[in-house]
Amino acid sequence: MKGQRNIGMVAHDERKEDLLDWVQHNLQALIPHRIFATGTTGGLLRQRFGDLTITPMKSGPLGGDQQLGSMIAEGRLDMLFFLIDPMAPHPHDVDIKALLRLAVLYNIPAAYNRSTADFLITSPFMTGEYIPEIKDYTPYVKRLGAK
């Protein structure tokens, strides 16, 4: 991947303002990229940052996390910024875990807190050439008899 990135953005309710502050701080770095965000997060981003290309998905609990996960599995999402609230229970916790698992499985850069997001956005790989190593799962697939 090089140049324009497809970026997933999610923030739990108690972290939405943190994400908005982070985006404001990094606005110029984000303008060249396409953002795909879960429902409420995407709506807030659109209201505040008209310069960004934002595609809102469904709300996380209504399938938005799974939509982003599908994009990862299909190779259509290059990185994920997901500001997680570790202090609150989430009724759709299984969806969140599935999204995080896919980010790990397909080896896309993912930030779950602001510090890691800062490291990713300032990395030379953000706009430069980067080809993530993808593990070959062929033996696993063949073991199950699937195609």
Swiss-Prot record:
Chain segments annotated as transmembrane: none
Listed GO MF terms: methylglyoxal synthase activity
Keyword Lyase: yes
InterPro entries, alphabetized: Methylgl_synth (IPR004363), Methylglyoxal_synth_AS (IPR018148), MGS-like_dom (IPR011607), MGS-like_dom_sf (IPR036914)
Entries under Pfam families matching the protein: MGS (PF02142)
Job description of the protein: Catalyzes the formation of methylglyoxal from dihydroxyacetone phosphate.
Protein's name according to its UniProt entry: Methylglyoxal synthase
Source organism per UniProt: Oleidesulfovibrio alaskensis (strain ATCC BAA-1058 / DSM 17464 / G20)
